[in-house]
């Protein structure tokens, strides 16, 4: 949920310094400081609770204290995604007043780009998942080693599958923090206090069937560093985000809850796609391998 705000610059600097001093001890993936409380990890664990993930595999996907996990990778310094707007559902900002910095169609294009990237990553996860179990139902490479790099390049098929799942989940979780989807209505909206849509559940628009139009009134904040210069006169990320419990926008708990619901929905959608593509028998075995810490012992 967290972007490169001044606090994140401190975190990034600490991470780089830590890497230089002790490469084995990079420990900032799920931050529990500077107002942050491992939101992506907590959302993922809540959303996937009861889905059958082994403890070690869930640690890889969600992260744990001292690691980013697959879901936290877009916020990791050096991964190259911190300032990629669609990886965090940013820059879909618009306000109904003359001369606003971008048009409604431009804002909607940014929102569509975020959704498109989510499903591109889910499609990549679906493709890599096929390497875990062969058509004859024998196992492929099901290992993860001691850890997964989640660097966009290296890793076993299971690591790459988890990585792409994590990238998709990160964007969908950020959507609820960075947009006005769950926000309470504002009686007199302004650029600094934009309207809320007051939804209580996941956005159908982020589901597997793309509706024809972006939901009316949906926006996300303009992100840039520094925002006062990059987003002058616009609905800023700073105005809309619910990244931390102390945000002035309010709605943190609701955003966390709905993001967890969407996380489970995305896993269920992905599971259905695995079965549809690879058949029930092979597909169920693939899903078992993804979830299991010891797949060759537990997946038959």
Residue positions per predicted region:
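Bacterial N-terminal signal peptides that target proteins for export
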Residues: 1-12
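Classical secretory targeting signals
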Residues: 18-19
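N-terminal signal peptide c-region/cleavage motif recognized by signal peptidases
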Residues: 22-23
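N-terminal, motif-rich segments that launch catalysis or mediate targeting to/interaction with membranes
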Residues: 26-166, 178-300
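Catalytic glutamate of the conserved HExxH
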Residues: 167, 171, 175
């Amino acid at each position: 949920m967290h972007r490169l705000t001044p606090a994140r610059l401190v975190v990034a600097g600490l991470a780089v310094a830590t890497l230089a001093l002790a490469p084995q001890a990079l420990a900032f993936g799920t931050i529990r400081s500077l107002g942050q409380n491992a939101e992506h990890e907590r959302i993922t664990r809540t959303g996937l609770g009861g889905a059958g993930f082994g403890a070690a595999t869930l640690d890889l996907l969600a992260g744990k204290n001292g690691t980013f996990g697959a879901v936290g990778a877009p916020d990791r310094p050096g991964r190259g995604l911190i300032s990629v707007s669609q990886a965090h559902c940013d820059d879909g900002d618009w306000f109904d007043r003359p001369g606003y910095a971008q048009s409604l169609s431009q804002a909607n294009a940014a929102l569509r780009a975020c959704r498109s990237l989510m499903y591109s990553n889910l499609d990549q996860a679906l493709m890599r998942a096929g390497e875990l179990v062969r058509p004859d139902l024998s196992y492929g490479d099901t290992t993860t080693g001691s850890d997964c790099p989640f660097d966009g390049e290296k890793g076993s098929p299971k690591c790459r599958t988890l990585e792409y799942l994590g990238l998709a989940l990160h964007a969908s979780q950020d959507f609820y923090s960075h947009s006005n989807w769950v926000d309470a209505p504002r009686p007199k909206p302004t650029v600094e206090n934009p309207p809320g849509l007051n939804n209580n559940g996941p956005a159908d628009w982020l589901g597997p069937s793309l509706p024809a139009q972006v939901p009316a009134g949906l926006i996300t904040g303009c992100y840039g560093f520094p925002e006062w210069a990059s987003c002058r006169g616009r609905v800023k990320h700073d105005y809309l985000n619910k990244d931390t419990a102390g945000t002035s926008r309010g709605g943190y708990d609701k955003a966390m809850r709905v993001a967890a619901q969407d996380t489970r929905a995305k896993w269920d959608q992905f599971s259905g796609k695995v079965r549809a593509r690879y058949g029930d028998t092979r597909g169920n075995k693939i899903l078992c391998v993804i979830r299991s810490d010891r797949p060759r012992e537990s997946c038959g």
